[in-house]
Swiss-Prot record:
Keywords: Metal-binding, Oxidoreductase, Zinc. The keyword Metal-binding applies. NCBIfam families: hisD (TIGR00069). Zn(2+) binds at Q250, H253, D352, H411. The keyword Metal-binding applies. InterPro entries: Ald_DH/histidinol_DH, Histidinol_DH_CS, Histidinol_DH_monofunct, Hstdl_DH. Its EC number is 1.1.-.-. GO terms for molecular function: histidinol dehydrogenase activity; metal ion binding; NAD binding. The active site is at E318, H319. Belongs to the histidinol dehydrogenase family. Transmembrane segments: none annotated. It comes from Shouchella clausii (strain KSM-K16). This is Histidinol dehydrogenase homolog. One of its GO terms (biological process) is L-histidine biosynthetic process.
């Protein structure tokens, strides 16, 4: 039976803090809907101390910013984008349009049609999330989206040059230096200077994530995103240093980022706790990671790998790193996760930044019903049908009876007209 050696905050405690975020975001959205560009500008000034003549960067400004970025940084961005583009292109190639003749004269099909416009949010705040440019903008472009715009906030009153460079290289059609709820709402509802989009994607802080949730419906979204999560599944072949390093490597994202260990080894669990305490003494981001670990960290001791799968599927975490003798066991048996990282040779940082899979992944148990962002999220699977006259009459006779069975007389009339015109 699973034994909790360490537990984080309860769901009820987390919900209490979320209620305040929900109310704040709702009021900001309502204000922007009412006041438009004026509210966007005032909120940008209030939250980011940012009030430029135009939020949108001109082609000349982008060119100047790109030139200011060191060549090595640009080369690394290009390398990462090559990996992400290649995998996204392979995923796109796996999605096929079809047309089949299901019975004589009845032709059914579907087409995968890209969304016309997408707004991508590239977070800033504590860290410039350069990689989010690749994951959202580039992936949308590979999917065939015609208009892809990107918003990213200023950082300490400055334009994040590396982020803008990545957005530009990824293929953004419009780049705005604008952050927070004001950016999400402006993209969703439109303003005097920003044309509304059909879909919002990308991660962000609690306020950005809540804005996306509240705006869902008038626009599509990729998924509901919460604080990043990491789960490590390990047996006695793993070592405490690697487990602790990989847990803290994600805990540094923010003070509410859950980091969990499921292990069959009590010895490893104890080593990991000690190693985390040791690493927190020197980790530059310990001020954040320590809070995340103390308030949201978790260690679960299980009897065997089968029980580890059960517990891992209950958590349904965003990132699941497997440090066991046979990592593929979890590839074969787990069903609820955002992304799997199999073996000590890979890790979550690779997926977050460069290896090629998308880092926008489900959190807060959403992995129970959805995967992460990929080219398929930007495609609408739309069906169509057509019939020969003979098939129309045949289908119509059955449709007449089924419509009458349900009491839909107007529906029956549609079928009856075809039977009359095309039947023999």
């Amino acid at each position: 039976m699973a034994q909790y050696i360490k537990q984080g905050k309860s769901e009820s405690e987390l919900k209490d803090s979320h209620g305040k975020v929900e109310q704040t975001v709702a009021s900001l959205i309502a204000r922007i809907e009412k006041e438009g560009e004026t509210a966007v500008r005032e909120l940008s000034r209030q939250f980011d101390n940012w009030d430029p003549e135009q939020f949108r960067l001109s082609a000349e400004e982008i060119e100047k910013i790109v030139r200011s970025v060191p060549d090595q940084v640009k080369a690394d961005i290009c390398f990462a984008q090559e990996q992400i583009r290649h995998f996204a292109e392979q995923q796109r190639a796996s999605i096929q349009d079809i047309e089949v003749e299901t019975r004589p004269g009845v032709f059914l099909g579907h087409k995968n049609i890209p969304v016309n416009s997408v707004g991508c949010y590239i977070p800033g705040g504590r860290y410039p999330m350069v990689a989010s440019s690749h994951m959202s903008i580039l992936t949308a472009k590979v999917a065939g989206v015609k208009r892809v715009i990107g918003c990213t906030p200023p950082i300490n009153g400055e334009i994040p040059a590396a982020t803008v460079t990545a957005m530009h290289f990824a293929g953004a059609d419009e780049i705005y230096i604008l952050g927070g709820v004001q950016a999400m709402t402006a993209m969703a509802v439109g303003t005097e200077t920003i044309e509304a989009v059909d879909m919002l994607v990308g991660p962000g802080n609690a306020f950005v994530a809540e804005a996306k949730r509240q705006l869902f419906g008038r626009v599509g979204i990729d998924l509901f995103a919460g604080p990043t999560e990491v789960l490590i599944i390990a047996d006695d072949t793993a070592d405490g240093e690697m487990v602790a390093t990989d847990l803290l490597g994600q805990a540094e994202h923010g003070p509410t980022s859950p980091a969990a260990l499921i292990t069959t080894s009590k010895k490893l669990a104890e080593e990991t706790v000690a190693e985390i305490e040791r690493q927190l003494q020197t980790l530059p981001t310990a001020d954040v990671a320590k809070v995340a670990w103390e308030e949201h960290g978790m260690i679960i001791l299980v009897d065997d790998l089968a029980e580890a799968v059960v517990e891992a599927d209950k958590l349904a975490y965003e990132h699941v790193q497997v440090l066991t003798e046979n990592p593929n066991y979890f590839l074969d048996h787990m069903t609820n996760y955002g992304a799997l990282f199999l073996g000590p040779e890979t890790n979550v940082a690779y997926g977050d930044k460069v290896i090629g899979t998308n880092h926008t992944l489900p959190t807060k148990k959403a992995a129970k019903y959805t995967g992460g962002l990929w080219v398929g999220k930007f495609l609408k699977n739309c069906t169509y049908q057509r019939c020969t006259p003979e098939a129309s009459a045949e289908i119509g006779r059955i449709a007449e009876r089924l419509c009458e069975l349900e009491g839909f007389i107007g529906h029956k009339a549609q079928a009856s007209l075809r039977v009359k015109r095309y039947g023999k």
